[in-house]
């Protein structure tokens, strides 16, 4: 299978104060989120001038992917589209059609399976092609890459740097975005949480740490709905009660600095740590690192050349899915599960 373009598909984020509320309304459309909750979340964005870091990082990643494709001998145009804010994926796919693109590889900024990590991006692809209509390019979503060796190495280096900056014996804590327990059980089952735990295991092994914690962050929704726990701040409180005063937090659930990273960890978690005399260091995310861009090229090459998936080896490997064409569901154990 040959491609004549690449599409970087992401979540999106506002790039000015006037964009914050419309962006949040797009994100929460149809979910019945009360206006006062949107106002509360909007304040997180206003804290940073109404600008999410994600679009800037993704534009830099587009440039890196383009350079890595050229270095690999596969020069292709790289397009950028989002689910929730400009550039919207529908507009990007229309641009691709107008430029004569016939088949594009789609690399998403989510390494995971499950609904939020995989199926929503599949739905984005189907919606964009339907909006464009006749002449829309074939869009091939690349596989999940939570256990790609390059991703493991990037997180391992970030963890090592964070741990070495702390004094004394530090606790290693991995975080990822929480989701409702029912959603996690519906896919796999528990595909997403197992993938997160497996990546944590791989990164810990690569850094020589056998003892670590996996916790969750950024939950939302009604308090009576159970989500993956413990929350990072609650876990910091538990560590404090055990007398632990140095913590390295590694947000392995995120490939770049989403607002959830810079607000929930760099502000809320750090504020709690400072108030309770805990030294906290947050590990870096891959962002626009050239090795992360090469990971995307690896996934493309697997499809073009028919290579087997490049996956890190570890104890009790967890399945990965995600490959699909034109918004087709990827697997009965991931995307193929019917949503309620």
Curated annotation (Swiss-Prot):
Could you state one GO biological process linked to this protein?
heme biosynthetic process
Q: In which pathway does it act?
A: Porphyrin-containing compound metabolism; protoheme biosynthesis
For the ligand (Fe-coproporphyrin III), the binding residues are 52, 121
Q: Molecular function terms in GO for this entry?
A: ferrochelatase activity; metal ion binding
Principal location: cytoplasm
Q: Which InterPro entries match?
A: Ferrochelatase, Ferrochelatase_AS, Ferrochelatase_C, Ferrochelatase_N
Catalytic reaction list? Fe-coproporphyrin III + 2 H(+) = coproporphyrin III + Fe(2+)
What Pfam families does the record tag this protein with? Ferrochelatase
* Top-rank taxon, per record: Bacteria
State the GO CC annotations. Answer: cytoplasm
Compartments, record wording: Cytoplasm
Q: Which keywords does this Swiss-Prot/TrEMBL entry list?
A: Cytoplasm, Heme biosynthesis, Iron, Lyase, Metal-binding, Porphyrin biosynthesis
**For this protein, what is the EC number?**
4.99.1.9
Does Lyase count among this protein's keywords?
A: yes
Q: What class of enzyme is it?
A: lyase
* Role description: Involved in coproporphyrin-dependent heme b biosynthesis. Catalyzes the insertion of ferrous iron into coproporphyrin III to form Fe-coproporphyrin III.
Q: Tell me the protein family, please.
A: Belongs to the ferrochelatase family.
Question: Under which name does UniProt file this protein?
Answer: Coproporphyrin III ferrochelatase
Give the species: Mycobacteroides abscessus (strain ATCC 19977 / DSM 44196 / CCUG 20993 / CIP 104536 / JCM 13569 / NCTC 13031 / TMC 1543 / L948)
The top of its lineage is: Bacteria, Bacillati, Actinomycetota, Actinomycetes, Mycobacteriales
**What gene does this protein come from?**
cpfC
């Amino acid at each position: 299978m040959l491609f004549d373009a690449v599409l970087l598909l992401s979540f999106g984020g506002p790039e000015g104060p006037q964009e914050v509320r419309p962006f949040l309304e797009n994100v929460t459309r149809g979910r019945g989120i009360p206006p006062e909750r949107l106002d509360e979340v909007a304040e997180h964005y206003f804290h940073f001038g109404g600008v999410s870091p994600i679009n800037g990082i993704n534009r830099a990643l587009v440039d890196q992917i383009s350079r890595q494709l050229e270095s690999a001998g596969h020069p292709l145009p790289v397009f950028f589209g989002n689910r929730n804010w400009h550039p919207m994926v529908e507009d990007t796919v229309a641009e691709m059609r107008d430029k004569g693109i016939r088949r594009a590889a789609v690399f998403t900024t989510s390494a995971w399976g499950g609904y939020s990590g995989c199926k929503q991006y599949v739905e984005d692809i189907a919606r964009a092609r339907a909006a464009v209509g006749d002449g829309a390019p074939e869009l091939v979503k690349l596989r999940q890459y939570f256990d790609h060796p390059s991703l493991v190495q990037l997180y391992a280096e970030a963890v090592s740097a964070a741990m070495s900056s702390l004094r004394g014996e530090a606790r290693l804590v991995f975080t990822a975005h929480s989701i409702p327990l029912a959603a996690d059980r519906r896919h796999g089952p528990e595909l997403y949480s197992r993938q997160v735990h497996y990546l944590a295991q791989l990164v810990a092994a690569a850094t020589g740490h056998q003892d670590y914690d996996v916790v969750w962050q950024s939950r939302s929704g009604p308090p009576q709905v159970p989500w993956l726990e413990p929350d990072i701040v609650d876990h910091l409180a538990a560590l404090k009660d055990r007398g632990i005063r140095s913590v390295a937090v590694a947000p392995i659930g995120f490939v770049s600095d989403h607002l959830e990273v810079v607000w929930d960890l760099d502000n809320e978690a750090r504020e709690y740590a400072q108030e309770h005399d805990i030294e906290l260091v947050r590990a870096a995310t891959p962002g626009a690192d050239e090795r992360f861009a090469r990971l995307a090229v690896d996934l493309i090459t697997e499809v073009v050349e028919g290579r087997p998936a490049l996956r890190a080896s570890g104890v009790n490997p967890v399945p990965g899915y995600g490959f699909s064409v034109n918004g087709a569901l990827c697997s009965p154990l991931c995307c193929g599960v019917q949503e309620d």
